[in-house]
């Protein structure tokens, strides 16, 4: 069954108590490595939280439901200079969140899966934020309502990709305009950007 993080090592030691000594020693070494990795992760996470806490751009981006410290910092680092994008709607394409377009001389054009071009870490962070907004956040917002409509019409995976693309546009717009998120923010920008759900 499920074992709490704090009780994991104790449970493993209990299981290997009567095992072969060489096998038990190798497991002990792996437990030591695991503990060191977790401690290092926790230290790095505390540093990240301090960086975000003192960064006005990250704090602004975190006003969007589903966007936490890691997502905010990943997006800021990935974009670097927001003014290099003339239009907010192009940011999603930069991170590979727009559908690929298939063309031939004899058939009708159609859109496929997202292109997955650009920085994969930023794309994954945006998708994680989109999934959090749709599946965990309960507070209403125009952006969440838009995503849930796509989920009902198509699938949750399509909705996550579409909301991630929209988030890229919204986060960029907020950054450039120095505007915090509000629950109706997605309504106007949805209409203006005319984004299509990913396939």
Stretches found by the model and what they are:
Residues 21, 43, 50, 135, ...:
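Intrinsically disordered or highly flexible coil/loop and linker segments, enriched in small
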Residues 106-110, 144-199:
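Low-complexity, acidic/Ser/Thr- and charged residue-rich accessory regions of DNA metabolism proteins
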């Amino acid at each position: 069954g499920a074992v709490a993080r704090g009780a994991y090592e104790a449970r493993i030691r209990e299981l290997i108590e009567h095992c072969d000594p060489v096998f038990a020693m190798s497991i002990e070494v792996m437990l030591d490595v695991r503990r060191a990795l977790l401690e290092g992760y926790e230290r790095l996470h505390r540093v990240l939280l301090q960086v975000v806490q003192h960064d006005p751009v990250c704090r602004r981006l975190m006003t969007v439901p589903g966007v936490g410290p890691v997502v905010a910092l990943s997006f800021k680092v990935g974009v670097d200079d927001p003014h290099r994008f003339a239009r907010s709607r192009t940011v999603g394409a930069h991170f590979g969140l727009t559908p690929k377009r298939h063309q031939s001389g004899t058939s009708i054009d159609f859109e496929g899966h997202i292109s997955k071009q650009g920085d994969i870490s930023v794309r994954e962070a945006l998708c994680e934020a989109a999934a959090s907004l749709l599946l965990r956040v309960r507070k209403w917002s125009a952006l969440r309502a838009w995503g849930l409509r796509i989920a009902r019409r198509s699938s949750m995976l399509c909705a996550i990709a579409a909301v991630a693309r929209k988030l890229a546009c919204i986060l960029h717009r907020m950054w450039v305009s120095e505007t915090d998120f509000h629950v109706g923010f997605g309504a106007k920008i949805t209409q203006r950007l005319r984004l299509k759900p990913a396939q």
